[in-house]
Amino acid sequence: MTISPPESGEKNKKVLEDPVKADPRPIDFAKLDKPGFWSTKLSKGPKTTTWIWNLHADAHDFDVHTGDAEEATRKIFSAHFGHLAVIFIWMSAAFFHGARFSNYSGWLADPTHVKPGAQQVWAIVGQEMLNADLGANYNGIQISSGIFHMWRAWGITNESELMALAIGAVVMAALMLHAGIFHYHKAAPKMEWFQDIESMLNHHIAGLVGLGSLAWAGHCIHIGAPTAALLDAIDAGSPLVINGKEIATIADMPMPHQLCDPQIIGQIFPGLASGTGNFFSLNWLAFSDFLTFKGGLNPVTGSLWMTDVSHHHLAFGVIAIIGGHMYRTNYGIGHSMKEILDSQQGDPILFPAPKGHQGLFEFMAESRHAQLAVNLAMLGSISILVSHHMYAMPPYPYIATDYMTVLGLFTHHMWIGGLFIVGAGAHAGIAMVRDYDPAKHIDNVLDRILKARDALISHLNWVCMWLGFHSFGLYIHNDTMRALGRPQDMFSDSAIQLQPIFAQWVQSIQASAVGTSLLAGTAEALPHKALSEVFNGSLVEVGGKVAIAPIPLGTADLMIHHIHAFQIHVTVLILLKGVLYARSSRLIPDKASLGFRFPCDGPGRGGTCQVSSWDHVFLALFWMYNCLSIVIFHFSWKMQSDVWGLTGGNFAQSSITINGWLRDFLWAQASQVLTSYGQSISMYGLMFLGAHFIWAFSLMFLFSGRGYWQELFESIVWAHNKLKVAPTIQPRALSITQGRAVGVTHFLVGGIATTWAFFHARLFGLG
């Protein structure tokens, strides 16, 4: 890809003196109206049906539009604003449904008995069956997004506030759309502005993250926490009194702007009304009533304390603002990313790379795919961490006792994390093919890793086989012993124990640290509630339901965790092989010249199919799907069995055999979705069937070759010609790569929607 050279006279200018180019691409509607306008070939219009597939494949592949890195970067930057606009429209729709069609007020008044609903189905051909009685005189579809719980945490107390948010989000969407057009067509940043890494880090860390977190802390402190205190007191049956008036219902509560009145807020949090004098005199203890470190869960709501959440965002915002200023920008002080990387040398014994990290700064700064790969890997990992925190540290009021929401958010964040991590492998592969120049990376760490790729992949392959045979072998052994009537010879907590001693040790050191200074790192003892209850803590019950409880680990957990390890390692093996062998291999030394995606190395070279970096991503998606299916099945059964008390604690003895998973999890828990007809959850029965069909439909694309279909099309076209209705656009069978793309998409969508229906019908069906 070419890099646009600086314009004449600009080389000596500082980036921030003239960061944009005015009117680089005037809007040309005649051009934009033409599908495929970026390509001379596609813009001529379709001659065969392959045209529509190429249009989809290349529409967002900005690299191939012009080959100019600056132009591609501007398109990415502009597209970010478009993405934000879509997000704001989506948020607006959620707020609007909450304002007009939901039972938010009814749920807010009685969150332990009323179920959240935000949509009512019209009676056209009997769909009113789907409207369940959710309580508080409301019939509608039960939702499990956690959005009501989040709104309560924000401090939203009525539908008028939701409507204001809906309007505000639409306005923000319009602003974002305008910004996207403006920063591409009217004032587009120059390449030097995008490459000013230290300034970018400064603004992103201190500005977006730091000030964003600080602003949110302000909302939590002034609106969220006081509202939560009033609502919690109502729910606990001991309402607060403000100005001599008992706040017994939501209707009695002060308006949000009134909470900023020191006279009113001082009756909820005296420290909040004490003014800024305490801040500047460093008497910060005066603020300890609304900036707390209580730990544990609020016993009324089963969620983190809002005052703890406020404290967290304040502290994080301050840290990010300080951290964002450690890079060298205008004043010649601070860190230079290039200097840091260039000075990092490889270990001379373990990892001898004479040139260390030299060249990495330029590669990361110039390759958008390399940046995206790193960001996707990190964001995917963060998403998986979020999924675990949703049950271990429930952030929103009453969310912990809404079991379908807990399971739904866990599943959602696991899928998102998995897709992002596979995306990281995809864009790392593209970076290697399109952006990596071997001549610039001689004897640095990237070069050394590529030279050691055979050792890395063969060892990783050995690890995968070891984990796969041993972990699956434990299950096969147990199934065999149970079939032969020899329970004493099974791996279980009551026979041959395989206790997860390291995981149990981690749990115990967390619990034993309470009352000591072991983990806190200070002389002050760790308070009793500073740790999640899942670490050998105590049970918290809200409204007669378990919100959180200790999660015991045993032989069954060790066995399934080794299945997780096996599947994660295989997914990584496929992705890593796709990256390390993206440019060349012993089989195809000139792979880089074939590009990121190609079906085979041309006719006449057998055995060279499915070797492109794209094909590795294709295969990794299946392993990612299987891996996460087992993860979410494990979580669902474990929580129902050992925490929520829904299956009588059968996980430890039933999940140690393959038959147990099939009989006591899949079959037993599918009873709700299979018998859902005639009930409000009947749409999940239909979805279960339909999603199975979509999944099965994928096999048609994955198992058959294009020749079969082209042969069929030829005879169908012949029949059309006979009838004088032949199409002007010539039918073409999908290419090998297109068929795989359509196949894996239907496989994933069908599988995910099947699981969606299975989980929802199960927990909604149990009530």
Curated annotation (Swiss-Prot):
Q: Where does phylloquinone bind?
A: W709
Task: Spell out the molecular function terms from Gene Ontology.
Answer: 4 iron, 4 sulfur cluster binding; chlorophyll binding; electron transfer activity; magnesium ion binding; oxidoreductase activity
Q: Where does divinylchlorophyll a' bind?
A: H692
Enzymatic reactions = reduced [plastocyanin] + hnu + oxidized [2Fe-2S]-[ferredoxin] = oxidized [plastocyanin] + reduced [2Fe-2S]-[ferredoxin]
The residue ranges flagged as biased composition, category Basic and acidic residues, are 8-22
Q: Where is the protein found, in the record's own terms?
A: Cellular thylakoid membrane
| Free-text cofactor note | PSI electron transfer chain: 5 divinyl chlorophyll a, 1 divinyl chlorophyll a', 2 phylloquinones and 3 4Fe-4S clusters. PSI core antenna: 90 divinyl chlorophyll a, 22 carotenoids, 3 phospholipids and 1 galactolipid. P700 is a divinyl chlorophyll a/divinyl chlorophyll a' dimer, A0 is one or more divinyl chlorophyll a, A1 is one or both phylloquinones and FX is a shared 4Fe-4S iron-sulfur center.
- The protein's predominant localisation is membrane
What keywords does the record list, in alphabetical order? 4Fe-4S, Chlorophyll, Chromophore, Electron transport, Iron, Iron-sulfur, Magnesium, Membrane, Metal-binding, Oxidoreductase, Photosynthesis, Photosystem I, Thylakoid, Transmembrane, Transmembrane helix, Transport
InterPro entries found in the cross-reference section: PSI_PsaA (IPR006243), PSI_PsaA/B (IPR001280), PSI_PsaA/B_CS (IPR020586), PSI_PsaA/B_sf (IPR036408)
Q: Where is this region: Disordered?
A: 1-22
**One record GO biological process:** photosynthesis
For the ligand ([4Fe-4S] cluster), the binding residues are: C600, C609
For this record, an example GO cellular component is: plasma membrane-derived thylakoid membrane
Q: How does it assemble?
A: The PsaA/B heterodimer binds the P700 divinyl chlorophyll special pair and subsequent electron acceptors. PSI consists of a core antenna complex that captures photons, and an electron transfer chain that converts photonic excitation into a charge separation. The cyanobacterial PSI reaction center is composed of one copy each of PsaA,B,C,D,E,F,I,J,K,L,M and X, and forms trimeric complexes.
Q: Which HAMAP family match?
A: PSI_PsaA
Q: What does this protein do?
A: PsaA and PsaB bind P700, the primary electron donor of photosystem I (PSI), as well as the electron acceptors A0, A1 and FX. PSI is a plastocyanin/cytochrome c6-ferredoxin oxidoreductase, converting photonic excitation into a charge separation, which transfers an electron from the donor P700 chlorophyll pair to the spectroscopically characterized acceptors A0, A1, FX, FA and FB in turn. Oxidized P700 is reduced on the lumenal side of the thylakoid membrane by plastocyanin or cytochrome c6.
| PANTHER family documented for this protein | OUTER MEMBRANE PROTEIN, OMPA-RELATED (PTHR30128), PHOTOSYSTEM I P700 CHLOROPHYLL A APOPROTEIN A1-RELATED (PTHR30128:SF19)
The Swiss-Prot or TrEMBL record describes its family as follows: Belongs to the PsaA/PsaB family.
> Which protein are we looking at?
Photosystem I P700 chlorophyll a apoprotein A1
Its source organism is Prochlorococcus marinus (strain MIT 9301)
From the broadest rank down, the organism's phylogenetic lineage runs: Bacteria, Bacillati, Cyanobacteriota, Cyanophyceae, Synechococcales
